[in-house]
Swiss-Prot record:
The modification Methionine (R)-sulfoxide is found at M44, M47. It catalyses: ATP + H2O = ADP + phosphate + H(+). Keywords: Acetylation, ATP-binding, Cytoplasm, Cytoskeleton, Hydrolase, Methylation, Nucleotide-binding, Nucleus, Oxidation. This is Actin, cytoplasmic 3. One of its GO terms (molecular function) is ATP binding. Pfam families: Actin (PF00022).
Length: 375
């Protein structure tokens, strides 16, 4: 591998795609992982209407489009749309020729094997990349926090997982996955706002609700007490202006929405909350390393950006763990992008250069090479 060629780092999230160059401290391009197609027939000739739009352009034209996310729960469900997103990433956002740069991609742990094989195939066959690698998202977040041991609770738009890592190795038997993340919280907020009399139904309106969620929601330290405060006074109410100028008021929904992370029963799910999942993940590890995991619990991903989430995690895990245990929740301010930052660090390490899967290796072995070289 030539040193002068910059590697590309692409973190394909269910909600946002983060892309840029290895060695940079932040992604150059961050755009929604959305492909939009017109809902109506184009009647004006020469408008340059396209049959599909990607990312921010799809977002800005959402009023006339049907929006689809090709990645659901961290798994690519629509490869044609995914290819459009990658094409957009390379040619429109980063403005690079993918055949000239090694590409580091990311994926959720416990993904189906076929998913990474197909990613590998598209990179080499459609985009002709000289080399590529697929890394596990949570491991990259830990790199970004400067640790080699810890448990990462990574929660994005599509999937949440807890990954214990010891001396740089992920412990696969103790990885737990929870299909409850940002998109489910957005849907839940749509539902509870509807109960308040505000109707949000279309894919375009869902994006408005996502914005409300990102701007106004927070995690309560004590849910019952917060509910009592909300019902007795209007101190927790906030207003939000919709695109048409209408102003809506939102009260206990602000903390009821993210509370579902701790009480998935709110969404009709039988799974454990993020605090219990983190605890269960630690308990699946060897008794000798648990202390190090409790003391290095790292939050990562956009769904961990709610104010109050770290304090609440601290409180909940302290209640579950042995009473003498030191518990430390690490919530770096840049955690929204820590997967990408970790990828940027990894791809620029000199020791990593022999880890790339080269085009030649791919031609010799086919897509299954990815399981041998990436773990």
């Amino acid at each position: 591998m030539e040193d002068e060629v910059a590697s590309l780092v692409v973190d394909n999230g269910s909600g946002m795609c983060k892309a840029g160059f290895a060695g940079d401290d932040a992604p150059r391009a961050v755009f929604p992982s959305i492909v939009g197609r017109p809902r109506h027939q184009g009647v004006m000739v020469g408008m340059g209407q396209k049959d599909s739009y990607v990312g921010d352009e799809a977002q800005s034209k959402r009023g006339i489009l049907t929006l689809k996310y090709p990645i659901e729960h961290g798994i690519v469900t629509n490869w044609d749309d995914m290819e459009k997103i990658w094409h957009h990433t390379f040619y429109n956002e980063l403005r690079v020729a993918p055949e000239e740069h090694p590409v580091l991609l990311t994926e959720a742990p416990l993904n189906p094997k076929a998913n990474r094989e197909k990613m590998t195939q598209i990179m080499f066959e459609t985009f002709n990349t000289p080399a590529m690698y697929v890394a596990i998202q949570a491991v990259l977040s830990l790199y970004a926090s400067g640790r080699t041991t810890g448990i990462v609770m990574d929660s994005g738009d599509g999937v949440t997982h807890t990954v214990p890592i010891y001396e740089g190795y992920a412990l696969p038997h103790a990885i737990l996955r929870l299909d409850l993340a940002g998109r489910d919280l957005t849907d839940y907020l749509m539902k509870i706002l509807t109960e308040r009399g505000y109707s949000f139904t279309t894919t375009a309106e869902r994006e408005i609700v996502r914005d409300i969620k990102e701007k106004l929601c927070y995690v309560a330290l004590d849910f019952e007490q917060e509910m009592a405060t909300a019902s007795s006074s209007s101190s927790l109410e906030k207003s939000y202006e919709l695109p048409d100028g209408q102003v809506i008021t939102i009260g206990n929904e602000r903390f009821r929405c993210p509370e579902a992370l701790f009480q998935p029963s709110f969404l009709g799910m039988e799974s454990s909350g993020i605090h219990e999942t983190t605890y269960n993940s630690i308990m699946k590890c060897d008794v000798d390393i648990r202390k190090d995991l409790y003391a290095n619990t790292v939050l990562s991903g956009g769904t961990t950006m709610y104010p109050g989430i770290a304090d609440r995690m601290q409180k909940e895990i302290t209640a579950l763990a042995p009473s003498t245990m030191k518990i430390k929740i690490i919530a770096p301010p840049e955690r929204k992008y820590s997967v990408w930052i970790g990828g940027s660090i990894l791809a620029s390490l000199s020791t990593f250069q022999q880890m790339w899967i080269s085009k030649q290796e791919y031609d010799e072995s086919g897509p299954s090479i990815v399981h041998r070289k990436c773990f």
